[in-house]
């Protein structure tokens, strides 16, 4: 609006000064005034007005098909003046003011075009950079989509197979250790049962030994009693012998007295035979009693001796059995201690294996969780790259639209600058023809819009759309 207003002011000033309207095409923006030829004074003298005309040329550049605009200053041209009618005077001060205003406007437009040119070049460089980054991201997305998941899946499956194999090996080892432990527990139970049996046998042997000791004590007491009885019998035998001898002496004395009386009394009957018979009977009875007593004593002594020998043999056998039982108990105790040590070592090894198995299992679970986390991270990163790719596509589309808008603005600015210069074609000014400008400006551009919809890192749908633009 400000440019249009300043342009209308310049036209009004020109009309006030030169009394005529410049020849502009209908609808073209006012860029530079055209000074008609005019005559000065009545003398028909001619003068010239210096006019600076700018030509805008375009060189084809970069990716968008447009290059930076360049304003080149034409050399100063002397415009011959034609003689005005009589009485017409040219106000040079007003023309200089208008010319100065025109130069100021053209300078501002040149600066503005230079800024637009720089901005346009920056946008083109940014578009190139974004296209390169877009291509790199697309290649990375394709690489991640085509290779990494497969490789990660292969590595994941391989590690899972290895972990399963190790778990099976550890399970087999644990089962084998459990079987060995059960066997050792069975052996231990059997040895404990055998130990209990041996302890019972030991108790029975001790009980038998105690009974044998009681029998030995009873036999000893019986032997002592028999010895005392033998002594008493010996004393009784000695006493009976003495009594018998006394009786014999008394009988002999009586016999002698009787013999004396018989000799003295021949008429008395003979008693010697009767005494002799009685003596013989007593001697027979005494010898029989002595022999019976000796036989009974000998039989009792032999019985007691045999019983003592039997008891001694039983005691010795009991002692031997007790010694053997003690040795067996000691050997069983040593064997039990060794088995206890073996059992403790096996239990310790089993606990170590269980701890190692638990630690390895936790490590494998951590590895599985880490691999799953890496897979989720890769999926999230892939989704992020896809979103960035979609955002870059959107930014690229927006930049394409903005570039097209700037291109149209620049084309309008070129047409606004170039159209006033076309009015000076009679003066043989060098300018670019509209056909060349059209051939330089109008280029065809194809924009491919690829829409990728993702959900949880997975590609759900893809859509491709092509737009053809004529620039």
From Swiss-Prot:
PTM annotation: ADP-ribosylation prevents ability to form intermediate filaments. Phosphorylation at Ser-7, Ser-28 and Ser-32 by CDK1 and phosphorylation at Ser-60 by AURKB contribute to efficient separation of desmin intermediate filaments during mitosis.
BP GO terms, sorted: intermediate filament organization; nuclear envelope organization; skeletal muscle organ development
Gene name in the database record: DES
Linker 1: annotated segments: 143-152
Modified residues (Phosphothreonine): 17, 77
Spans annotated as Interaction with NEB: 269-416
Protein name: Desmin
Organism of derivation: Sus scrofa (Pig)
Residue ranges, annotated region (Tail): 414-471
Domain of life: Eukaryota
